[in-house]
Curated annotation (Swiss-Prot):
Keywords, in A-Z order: Dipeptidase, Hydrolase, Manganese, Metal-binding, Metalloprotease, Protease
PROSITE patterns: PROLINE_PEPTIDASE (PS00491)
Record field: catalytic activity: Xaa-L-Pro dipeptide + H2O = an L-alpha-amino acid + L-proline
Segments traversing the membrane: none
Record has NADP as a keyword: no
Name the record gives this protein: Xaa-Pro dipeptidase
Primary gene name: pepQ
Positions annotated to bind Mn(2+) 1: 255, 335, 380, 419
Cofactor: binding comment: Binds 2 manganese ions per subunit.
Pfam family of the protein (one): PepQ_N
Cofactor(s) needed by this chain: Mn(2+)
Species annotation: Shewanella piezotolerans (strain WP3 / JCM 13877)
Length: 440
């Protein structure tokens, strides 16, 4: 923790530098960052699970305390307005004493609607950063989530500090422990529901604490890209297992996927081929490389796998050009990762917010940036038997290039996705997921 505290000091210095830069450009006195506030369920007296503003948790690992605020100007010590109501119904957050507390000036707010007493007097020249524009209106903010400020902050979020990288290594380490436990549960005959409970128990995080809804899919359910239904009974025949699950550490996410075959067969061989291909793509990552080019290269490598496994026929380039590979691999290669699972800034060409759209033939790609040092990205190629997409191939001559007998053999297995979390360094890549022991 002492090492993390040292890195945190440097992290805060960098965030202050960024704020000083953008507020000077925009003639702002500073930023007032709202952690957020609870959302009440419709016609109910209960709230939805709280999700903190990512721009708030960028500054400090407070992810579960709504109605808190940060006042930052890039020069003075940040002010944390920390919500501690008098409340006998709920757990009230303790006064902060962790490693980060000495780096902020803490003031305690007991009533959420009294926050104006703690805010700068010249509020007109401060920008509100947060979700609740109605609150910003009441407080008198004229500058609310300025595009220029958000574009600048989101663009630079891709450049992770040493503190952020340390947090992401830890979140990967935690998730790997869960993945290993889930794999064992699968081979021991657990249901989807039971596997998820094993995973959450292994990482000591609840469903509302992990960074996204875990995907635990057996057999053909693995073909559903965002499957979260969770069957509570085991299938009569156990064929395959796909788990896409992460963990949280100090507000930073990991996002890891693995696929398994219950027995040695063609599907297991296909997993081996996809695993090898994924590592080849990771080896291509370095500063200056376009993420779009990596995605396209993945399609060409997948095309050769489809040919090798007699799933499709023809030449690899033709399978890509005709969109046949997209029917088997419809999503993007991956995305930026950090405070959010799909971290902001993946489409930004510069700090002014210039947008780089995904290629028309690959509309679901979530990142179009050029790789640079200290970026963290996921690499997650997949191959699936998705009938609604394959049906489109049957509408034209492309059907002749698909071996439907092999498709029928693979259909009960659903699909494969293999996802690692990778840091781009100046002279190498750091595969955090594999480094913590989650290999094939």
């Amino acid at each position: 923790m002492e090492q993390l505290a040292h890195l945190y000091h440097e992290h805060i210095s960098e965030l202050n530098r960024r704020v000083a830069d953008i507020t000077s450009r925009e003639n702002l006195s500073g930023l007032v960052i709202h952690s957020g506030q609870p959302h009440r369920q419709f016609l109910d007296d209960m709230d939805y699970p709280f999700k903190v503003n990512p721009h708030f948790k960028a500054w400090l690992p407070v992810i579960d305390n709504p109605n808190s605020w940060l006042v930052v100007n890039g020069h003075d010590k940040p002010t944390l307005i920390f919500y501690r109501p008098v409340d006998f119904w709920h757990k009230v957050a303790d006064e902060p004493t962790d490693f980060w507390a000495e780096y902020v000036d803490i003031k305690y707010l007991t009533k959420a609607d009294k926050v104006a007493e703690f805010l700068p007097a010249d509020i007109d020249n401060w920008a509100y950063i947060g979700e609740h524009l109605d609150v910003a209106d009441v407080l008198g903010f004229n500058r609310r989530n300025p595009d220029s400020v958000l574009s600048y902050l989101n663009y630079h979020r891709a450049d992770k500090t040493a503190y952020e990288l340390a947090c992401m290594r830890k979140s990967n380490s935690i998730a790997v422990t869960g993945h290993q436990a889930a794999k064992t549960a699968f081979y021991n005959g657990a249901s989807e529901f039971e596997i998820l409970q094993v995973y959450l128990s292994a990482i000591s995080q609840g469903e509302n604490q992990v960074p996204y809804s875990s995907i635990v899919a057996l057999n053909e359910n693995a073909a559903i890209l965002h499957y979260t239904a969770l069957e509570q009974t085991s299938p009569p025949q156990r064929l395959s297992f796909l788990i896409d699950a992460g963990a949280n550490f100090h507000g930073y996410a990991s996002d890891i996927t693995r696929s398994y075959a219950f027995e040695k067969n063609i599907f297991d061989d296909l997993i081996t081929a996809m695993d090898s291909m994924q590592l080849q793509i990771i080896a291509m990552m370095k500063p200056g490389v376009s993420y779009v080019d990596l995605h396209v290269a993945t399609h060409h490598k997948l095309a050769q796998i489809l040919i090798d496994f007699d799933i499709a026929t023809g030449d690899a380039a033709g399978l890509v050009e005709q969109g046949i590979t997209s029917a088997f691999f419809p999503h993007g290669l991956g995305h930026m990762l950090g405070l959010q699972v799909h971290d902001m800034g993946g489409f930004l060409a510069d700090e002014k917010g210039t947008h780089i759209a995904s290629p028309a033939e690959h509309p679901f790609l979530r990142c179009t940036r050029t790789l640079a040092e200290n970026q963290v990205l996921t690499i997650e190629p997949g191959v699936y038997i998705i009938d609604s997409l394959l049906a489109q191939l049957k509408q034209d001559n492309r059907q002749q290039q698909v071996n439907w007998n092999t498709v029928d053999i693979l259909r009960p297995f659903g699909g494969i996705r293999i996802e690692d979390n990778v840091i781009v360094h100046c002279d190498r890549t750091e595969n955090m997921t594999r480094n913590f022991g989650l290999n094939r």
